Amino acid sequence: MAPGGAASRLLTFSMSVDLPSSDPAVAVSVVVPERNEAENIVPLIQEITVALDGRWDFEIIYVNDGSTDATAAQLAAVMKQRGNLRQLQHAVSTGQSAAVRSGVRAARGAIVATLDGDGQNNPAFLPDLIAAVEKGGKRVGLAAGQRVGRKDTGFKKFQSRAANAIRSAILRDGTRDTGCGLKAFRRDVFLIMPYFDGLHRFLPALMRREGYEIAYVDVIDRPRRSGVSNYGFFDRLWIGIMDLAGVWWLIRRKKSTPVVTEVTSDDD
């Protein structure tokens, strides 16, 4: 039995085994990392379905990051009605980056789209993000949402603007807003990224590090439907400083990969 007393399909895989490969029958995997957002599950899944139905063959992967509310039971109930809904569970909360990575590793679509589980990210913008990745072909690794008309408090907006300004100045990633959960990217490219806690905040810089272009899509934010944020000011501040230093180091230490040609005995 899953937490919450509901039967649920669980996916378990070791970090050391081969990953599931992309499935041609699934074009897009929508990954939703969430913790204690049970009340937001049904309306968000409905909105995702309205946005993508008839345009792509897609699956929705909810990553339940150690929720202590009715999340598991709510997802199990919806899964009985929607065959394209999957639930992954973390036994304990490990954070958003780990939740996103679990979802991407389990995804069957060649393109992965992400959005937060609190309802602030509007799924209506998912088609624009996915189309930007498709249009970009092998050049574009990531389509990133950039929020306009944010519905957060004045203090939270100030925090975000200051953090984005500092990050952009140091990393020179050309990105106005890395905190938006609305993103779409190629699964294969994401999986070559160096993994660390906080990865999701630095995807544009790390994609550029690997030589990929970024497409930007303006999105309109919404107020949180219910629940409370899982982040505090000092959590963001100190962890963000350490992560920023680490990403700066990774970029500085990047080496160009030489062209490698194998010479065989048949070559003249």
State each model region's role.
Residues N84-A106, I111-T114, Q120-G198, P223-W249, ...:
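Acceptor/aglycone-binding surface of glycosyltransferases and processive sugar-polymer synthases
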Residues A27-S29, E59:
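Cell-envelope/extracellular polymer assembly enzymes that use nucleotide-activated donors
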Residues E39-P43, D69-A73, A98, D177:
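Residue-level preference for short helical/loop micro-motifs built around acidic side chains
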Residues E47-D57:
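Short, acidic, metal-binding catalytic loop of nucleotide-sugar glycosyltransferases
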Residues A2, S8-V26, A165, R172-D173, ...:
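Hydrophobic helical membrane-anchoring modules
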Residues W56-G66, L88-Q89:
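Short beta-strand/loop segment that forms part of the nucleotide-sugar
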Residues V32-Q46, G66:
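Active-site beta-to-alpha loop of glycosyltransferases that engages the nucleotide-sugar donor
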Residues N64-A73, G119:
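A conserved acidic beta->alpha catalytic loop
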